[in-house]
Amino acid sequence: MTGVQTCALPIFDVTLTSDHRQALEANGLVVPGVGAFGACMEGLKSVGGDTVIKDRLRAGRPVLGVCVGEQIMFERGMEHGTGTPGLGLIKGDVELLDADVVPHMGWDTVEAPEGSVLMKGVEGERFYFVHSFAAMSAAPADTSGDQLDFDDAEERVTWCTYGRSRFVAAYERGPLFATQFHPEKSAEAGSQLLRNWIATF
């Protein structure tokens, strides 16, 4: 929260909440996550967070998932050899990194696409990662069943390579934003990324 607060204040108040009304009405919603995919999904559902996220996206209100908060936006997490359903907002599975040393921990460069909102001005910078799992592919999911209004929005994917894995480092589509890295731990580049996101409000 500290990194988000630093970038948002004094323009915005930052509140840690599981209150539905506050989460729905906020200018932007950050969905953090640490630990296991399954535990994160279980905790999110226990407070109705899955519904809040989809309700916000349905209304075109920005959501930013960070680390496991990014991973749960995908269809499945493949930890422990089993597939745990995610929110299904991005097509793809979250899998164990193929590398000699796991977790991937530390600073790394990324490959940003043209026109990225999040990466504007920080395309050549390094970001801080701490993770063992990641999405190896990304494609727009069919969200028509959830009646989301951004099926025609352009998808922009930022990539990172670690070991033998090329994985999704950041994702943008309409009001949905997500990063596998931690912007709040990524010094000035991370602060600028958060400011870029805040500018979409």
Regions found by a protein language model. Name each.
Residues G35-G106:
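Cysteine-nucleophile active-site neighborhood
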Residues T2-L9:
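Short, small-residue-biased leader/transition segments that mark boundaries at the very start
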Residues R58, G92-F201:
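Amide-donor transfer/coupling interface in amidating biosynthetic enzymes
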Residues A26:
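An anion/phosphate-binding loop that grips the pyrophosphate of nucleotide cofactors and donors
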Residues V30-P32:
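Structural motif
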Residues M1, Q22-A23, R56:
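Structural alpha-helical scaffold elements that stabilize or flank donor/cofactor-binding regions
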